[in-house]
Every structure is written in C-alpha cells, then in structure tokens.
C-alpha cells in the first residue's frame, strides 16, 4: 500500500497522486502492478492506494543482495526479466502511457518470478504525438 500525505502537498502533487490512481485502475497486464483500491483516511489525512503485493520485493534490493553476497544473476534470468520489462513497457506505450521513472526500485518481483512495473505517479499520457502531463481527474 502506498500512503500519500495530502496535507501540505502542492496542487500538482495532489493531482499526480490522483493521476496514479486513474492510470493504475485502467491497466490490466501481467507485467504491470495491479491496482486494487484507493481511499482517503480522514484521521491521518492520507490518500491510501492499495496495490498488488509483490512478495519478492523490488529488483533494486535483489541487486544489492546479490552484490552483498558476491552473487551473479544467471544470464537466462536477465533475459527473462528484460523480456518482461519490455512487454510491460510495450503495453504502457500501446496505451499512450510513458512510465518516466523506470528504475530497479520500481520493478517488482512476485513469488512466482514474474516482474511487474509499478509506481506510475510520474507517468504521462501522450496526446497527438506530444507528451503532456495528465492532470485531469477521471
């Protein structure tokens, strides 16, 4: 679950949070984190975004763990991950969405070994061949 403290956020940041919810709710692909629900907690003044849980964390932590133990990823694993990342990106691009913050910390690994792209709060929608920040609320 992602918690966004709404108090003190700029209007732009609030719109960005709402945009992430709108984008996530419209996506359905095996390599994109699933959106579950969102709710506003009046007590804590936070917007709570419930997303699919990736049991094996993110790729950034896997890389750090391997470096710590001087382990290497198998080439086959790297290729499988690359293909899954590209399939997720293709799906986003086919839907005129650019991730804009693709990094190991935003690529998650499920318990069955599937990679999923997440954290789309800086995503933008491409319109008429030009990328524009999406600020509307659906």
Task: State the predicted function of each range.
Residues 37-39:
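A short, aromatic-enriched beta-strand patch in the conserved N-lobe beta-sheet
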Residues 44-58:
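Conserved short submotifs of the Hanks-type protein kinase catalytic core
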